């Protein structure tokens, strides 16, 4: 009975330690203003050395390549358009999708 309690206490302590380490390591990577700790701007660097920051895209998908999707119509550019389901009344939320637009016409990418 004593070994079971000791083992359970050890597993609980290990689990709590692991959870705390994970929490503190994840929060130490990002500072309060949302920048990565290792990320520096040009004004932070000595001697006026400017470094370009690699920025990641926001949430959602990336625009498609619209080459040769609009036939002979030019310019063919990607646009975000709302996709409304076939309901009689408009919804507050409906999904958006990428389409290729040329003039007033939309084409599937």
UniProtKB/Swiss-Prot annotation:
Matches recorded under InterPro entries: EPFL (IPR039455)
Signal peptide positions on this chain: 1-26
Keyword Signal: yes
Pfam families xrefs: EPF (PF17181)
Tissue specificity as recorded in UniProt: Expressed at the base of the apical meristem at 3 days after germination. Not detected in the hypocotyl. Expressed in developing stems soon after bolting, in inflorescence stems and in young siliques.
Compartments where located: Secreted
Annotated Gene Ontology cellular component terms: extracellular region
Gene Ontology biological process terms from the UniProt entry: guard cell differentiation; stomatal complex development
PANTHER family: EPIDERMAL PATTERNING FACTOR-LIKE PROTEIN 4, EPIDERMAL PATTERNING FACTOR-LIKE PROTEIN 4-RELATED
Quaternary state and interactors: Interacts with ERECTA.
Name recorded for this polypeptide: EPIDERMAL PATTERNING FACTOR-like protein 4
């Amino acid at each position: 009975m004593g070994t079971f309690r000791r083992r359970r206490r050890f597993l609980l302590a290990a689990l709590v330690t692991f959870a705390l380490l994970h929490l503190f390591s994840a929060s130490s990577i990002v500072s309060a203003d949302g920048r990565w700790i290792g990320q520096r701007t040009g004004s932070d660097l000595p001697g006026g050395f400017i470094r370009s920051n690699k920025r990641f895209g926001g949430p959602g998908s990336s625009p498609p390549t619209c080459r040769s999707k609009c036939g002979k119509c030019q310019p063919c550019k990607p646009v975000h358009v709302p996709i409304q389901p076939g309901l009689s009344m408009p919804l507050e939320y409906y999904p958006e999708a990428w389409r290729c637009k040329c003039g007033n016409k939309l084409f599937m990418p």
